[in-house]
Every structure is written in C-alpha cells, then in structure tokens.
C-alpha cells in the first residue's frame, strides 16, 4: 500500500485486503478509504449494510453520495410527492442533499456495499460514533445507543422519531433496558 498525507497523491488498495479499521455504526460498518482527517474537505468510505439491517430516518448538514458496489438496498429519499423508497442496485448512484431526511434498509439476503463520499465533518462523526470491529457483530447496548444519540445531537443531526419512522415503514429496534 502506498499512502501519503497532505496534498500528495494517495493510493490505497482497499480491494486487495489492505488492513483498514472497520467501524460499527450500530449495525452498518464503514471503512475509511481516505484518511479520517477532519481537516480535509471530503471523506470517502466503504460502507456495508448487512442483510436485514435498517438505518432509521435521519438528516444532517452534510451531503452524501453513494455508488452501490455490490448488492441492493432501499433508500428513503425526498420525491415529488414526499418521502419514498427507491431501490438502489450495484452500479446505481444516489445523491442525498444536505439537510434531507433519508434512511436505508437492506431487505435482500446479501450485504449491500457502497462507496460513500461525504464531508470530512461527517467522517469525523463516524470516527467518534463508531465502535471498532474486533469480531462477530454484537448488538448495541443501551449505552451504545445513548452515546450515538448524544454525538448525533452534538453534531446537529436530526434523528427521526419512532412515529416518523413508522410512517415510512421502519420499525425502531427495542434495546434491552431502553428504547
């Protein structure tokens, strides 16, 4: 692997199994393709949405762009008649403007893998909110959820309420000892 920092060129051979720390974001995982440096202007990640996993409705001041590399998932987007689910398949590109409510869910039997391009600020949020992946996936504890929610609030993210999520077909998970 060749890698430099600053304004120099970077080559990171993620596809060849170069060790990159994966972070668990309460189910989905991300791996940084670019350095997770808040001083940069953008961030590139490899995101994995496991089968059966849903990222509930949320919004933030950072645009996100997704190129679906493998698999398929549904993305909740603002359409002409309100929020609607769109299927995103391998090769599809999805743009989510800043401040737009959105969600993701994988109803397929296979993981959905995306190349995600967003702001360095959102990358910094992922760095702070994520738990290092060290083994098989573990369900989040109530403390993990509370920590994630507090960080989202600190970063100015808006998390959909259970009623807002239910209105678009998302059932919010119940965690032992809390909501």
What are these regions (language model features)?
Residues 1-42, 135-139, 145-179:
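A short, N-terminal "cap"/entry segment at the start of jelly-roll beta-barrel domains
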Residues 13-16, 28-30, 45-60:
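Conserved short histidine dyad/triad with adjacent acidic residue
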Residues 13-14, 38-39, 65-67, 79-98:
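Short acidic-glycine-tyrosine-enriched beta hairpin
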Residues 33-36, 54-60, 77, 85-86, ...:
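Short histidine-centered beta-strand/loop micro-motifs
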Residues 44-50, 59-79, 117-119:
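Short, conserved beta-strand element in jelly-roll/cupin
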Residues 90, 98-124:
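Ligand-binding loop in jelly-roll beta-barrel domains
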Residues 124-139:
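A hydrophobic, small-residue-rich beta->alpha segment in the mid-to-C-terminal subdomain
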